[in-house]
Amino acid sequence: MKKAQGSPALIILLIIGFAIELVTGSAGNEAALLKLGGLPDNSELHGEYWRIATYSFLHFNWLHLIVNVSLLLWIGRIVERQVGTTQAMLIYFASVLCSAALILVVHNWNPKAGATVGASGGIFGLLGAALIISCQQKGDDRLRRRLWIALLVGFTVSLFPGISMAGHAGGIVGGGLMALLVKIRMNES
């Protein structure tokens, strides 16, 4: 069984990101989070393309951070065991980028959507990858059921105000596509 190393490293980065928010007084302040690297509430990045990655290391408050860290610890380890740390981290970061892309498209249609922060796009990507990979493997029906329940709960939570449905949807699509590419590559070697 492959040992998960990427997820704990990502968790440390998320905690460091939140510590920076606390030190700068940015936690819970949308305008301050935007200055730190959140995605803007319009589709214009004004050349600040680093935001398509940095938003994922910031969190609105303690609860937001704790939920994402808990989910990353669970789902990240599953995917790392399925495909290895390097492939899992590629899936995660590709999902973050797909999440940002869909967020920016949606913000173009709804510029009052608000600034976006959080790792959930990458986490939803890992969830999508775990589902695709586990559905291709025999056995462990219990894991598949848990993943489907997590997906259902995740998208239900996405319906609440202030939660980025676009970010979650972009992440799961990116993660699912990356999982298919990773599996094809693994089958070829």
Task: For every predicted segment, state its role.
Residues 1-189:
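A detector for small-residue-rich transmembrane helices and their helix-helix packing motifs
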